[in-house]
A protein has these predicted regions:
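Aromatic-residue-lined binding/catalytic grooves and analogous aromatic/hydrophobic interfacial grooves
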Residues: 114-115, 139-152, 162-179
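Outer-membrane beta-barrel translocator domains and adjoining extracellular loop/strand segments
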Residues: 119-122
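Post-signal-peptide N-terminal segment of Sec-exported extracytoplasmic proteins
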Residues: 12-36
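Short, conserved alpha-helical segments within structured domains
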Residues: 93, 158-165
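Single conserved hydrophobic/aromatic residue that forms the stacking wall/gate
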Residues: 1-7, 12
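Short, surface-exposed glycine/acidic/tryptophan-bearing loops
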Residues: 37-43, 115
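Conserved, well-structured interaction surfaces
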Residues: 14-18, 43-112, 124-133, 142-155
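N-terminal propeptides
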Residues: 135-137
Length: 179
């Protein structure tokens, strides 16, 4: 029953939705805003940057909260799936979860630098870990995702595939200056 739950179409769609929509549309334009590509009526990009860069501003807090809400769901599904017997469905679920966790941390670390690294969910207050720890987890999760998804094809063009994992690995290596 647990495997059918975490591998169900509804659960899969919800995971995809949380990762994409949780951080809100702000996360998609953040680099343009803080990179000086957009500006206010004053014609100076710095005015926009100064008004949006407050940690309490919805622009920042909605991204942070959205990514961590998605991460909590991914970690929860992963903890359930890890306790199940080995099967192609289990491996697909774990591969997708590891991919999503890597993607979430890639987004977090490139936007915020040092972030709390949560390998499993906790109720405890957590502090920020060095960005290097987040990058290590991203690389580790992508390697694990490759292993879990190896030999499996995506159910649809829109789902995580081994090629998607390879593409995200390439992006990570570019960020880290690795070959």
């Amino acid at each position: 029953i647990r495997l059918s739950l975490v591998g169900s179409e509804m659960c899969i769609r919800d995971r995809y939705n949380k990762v994409q929509e949780g951080p809100t549309y702000y996360s998609y334009i953040a680099f343009d805003l803080f990179g000086g590509e957009l500006m206010t009526s004053t014609g100076r990009p710095i005015d926009l940057i100064n008004s949006l860069s407050n940690a309490l501003h919805t622009f920042v807090s909605s991204q942070w909260n959205g990514y961590y809400k998605a991460l909590l769901q991914v970690n929860n599904v992963m903890s359930i799936a890890e306790g199940l017997a080995d099967s192609p469905t289990r491996n697909r679920v774990l591969g997708e979860c590891r991919y999503f966790r890597a993607y979430i941390y890639l987004c977090l670390v490139t936007r915020f630098g040092d972030v709390p690294v949560l390998r499993q969910n906790t109720q405890a207050k957590v502090s920020r870990d060095p960005a290097s720890m987040a990058w290590e987890l991203v690389e580790e999760d992508l390697d694990a995702a490759s292993g879990f998804l190896n030999g499996l094809s995506a159910d649809s063009f829109y789902y995580v595939s081994p090629a998607a994992v390879t593409a995200l690995k390439a992006r990570v290596k570019l960020y880290l200056g690795k070959k």
